[in-house]
From Swiss-Prot:
Protein name: Holo-[acyl-carrier-protein] synthase
Subcellular location(s) of the protein: Cytoplasm
Family (UniProt): Belongs to the P-Pant transferase superfamily. AcpS family.
Keywords: Cytoplasm, Fatty acid biosynthesis, Fatty acid metabolism, Lipid biosynthesis, Lipid metabolism, Magnesium, Metal-binding, Transferase
Annotated function: Transfers the 4'-phosphopantetheine moiety from coenzyme A to a Ser of acyl-carrier-protein.
Binding site residues for Mg(2+): 8, 57
InterPro entries (UniProt xref): 4-PPantetheinyl_Trfase_dom, 4-PPantetheinyl_Trfase_dom_sf, ACPS, Ppantetheine-prot_Trfase_dom
NCBIfam families referenced in this protein's UniProt entry, alphabetically: acpS, pantethn_trn
Gene Ontology CC annotations of this record: cytoplasm
Organism lineage string: Bacteria, Pseudomonadati, Pseudomonadota, Alphaproteobacteria, Rhodobacterales
Cofactor: Mg(2+)
Annotated EC: 2.7.8.7
Catalysed reactions, as listed in the record: apo-[ACP] + CoA = holo-[ACP] + adenosine 3',5'-bisphosphate + H(+)
Gene Ontology terms: biological process: fatty acid biosynthetic process
């Protein structure tokens, strides 16, 4: 079952201007160290940050709150599997909100997709609830997400 859907569109040039103006103050407030290392290795640094910004906004919307109620930007972090697939991890308040919205007997799975076409970066986040398998039962309908 779908628990939440969120989307966001970010202007790469706006993020680039913000990076130029505020530098590390902006980076350290919004992005985890892993996100920063990833972005700084890319030729399109601003585009990489913009996609992650959009993903955090989209995730907060999928959680049903937007960026309020004590949520921290760093409570939501985007990384990538070896295949390149983006994944969203939540900690702190965002993880607490996710636990609250997940029905008993289910596990929450966060799906995220990112794209960009200069000057735009876009993200979609879907939060899905999958039934937990009974002890000793194999849940073939809902395979486990890929391991990182």
């Amino acid at each position: 079952m779908i628990l939440g859907i969120g989307t966001d569109l970010a202007n790469i040039e706006r993020i680039e201007r913000t990076l130029d103006r505020f530098g590390d103050r902006f980076r350290n407030r919004v992005f985890t160290e892993i996100e920063q290392r990833k972005a700084e290795r890319r030729s399109d640094t601003a585009g990489t940050y913009a996609k992650r910004w959009a993903a955090k906004e989209a995730c907060s919307k999928a959680l049903g709150t937007g960026l309020r109620m004590g949520i921290s930007w760093k409570d939501m972090a985007v990384s990538n599997l070896r295949s390149g697939q983006p994944v969203m991890q939540v900690t702190g308040w965002a993880a607490e909100r996710l636990r609250e919205m997940t029905p008993e007997g289910y596990e929450a799975i966060i799906h995220v997709t990112l794209t960009d076409d200069h000057p735009w970066a876009q993200a979609f986040v879907v939060i899905e609830a999958r039934p937990l398998a009974e002890v000793g039962e194999v849940n073939l309908t809902y395979p486990a997400p890929p391991r990182m």
